[in-house]
Amino acid sequence: MSNQELVTLNVGGMKFSTLSATLRRFPDSRLARMLDNADREIRIINGHYFIDRDGSLFSYILDYVRTSQLSLPSGFSEFERLQREAEFYQLLSLADLLSQDTLYRPRVEILEVRFLLQETHAFFRLFCSSSTTIEMMADRILMFAEQPMGSQGWSFPFSAQKPLAPVPLQRPSHHDVVFQCGTDYTNGEHVGARYVSIKPDQRKLINGTNVLGLLLDILLKEGFCLISTRSVSAEEKVECYTFERKKRPEVLTIHENSRQENYETETVQVKQAKPNKKR
């Protein structure tokens, strides 16, 4: 059979079409041997290879054979059944991967927000077990400081009239970020202020309570769940908000070495995968 010849499979009543070269990508698999008529359990009926297995799960099997990637929809739970299908088709690398409980055990992120409120300032510290999440939040949080107008030291009754310049956030480590907002006074006179903006919101906020409310709302929209609140220091008015987010990897890229019958996981990418209706 030519590698460019079109092959149609009937798996449990569902039909799939692909090239014979695709099915030969894993030469030790049942699908490759099928093309050489070396498998008695797979018969040709009406010109189609008939396989008496689960057709809906075969769509994931065929996608893996085509791309060497396992793409599962969000909320997929049939890992044990899919593993049995991989074993039937003798795709050993996929079966071994599906046997690992870490594949379908959600990864838990813990994020903590510490909020210190003083008379004219509010200080924030975000800590997260995932450095990637902290990088994402650091890119979205912007801090601005008022700049003096001219060399005469003129003062303005409204701080919004002064130009604002971006100020870098503090990064004590890869897992936390520190920023602040509020008004600076010297001898009772307003001399400057710091504002905070959190993308995609366009507002520049100076009030710490408003910034806190916006920050918590954004975290909830990002899939975090608030699991606890507590006062770290009642005297200094330090409040701590602890969030949790469970994430499951949905795309795993696998480097397959068919000849040596082994594999290694190169990367694990988290991305939203939609159910594939096309076959």
Swiss-Prot record:
Keywords: Endoplasmic reticulum. It comes from the Eukaryota. Residues 5-74 form the BTB domain. GO terms for biological process: negative regulation of delayed rectifier potassium channel activity; protein homooligomerization. InterPro entries: BTB/POZ_dom (IPR000210), SKP1/BTB/POZ_sf (IPR011333), T1-type_BTB (IPR003131). GO terms for cellular component: endoplasmic reticulum. This is Putative potassium channel regulatory protein. It comes from Xenopus tropicalis.
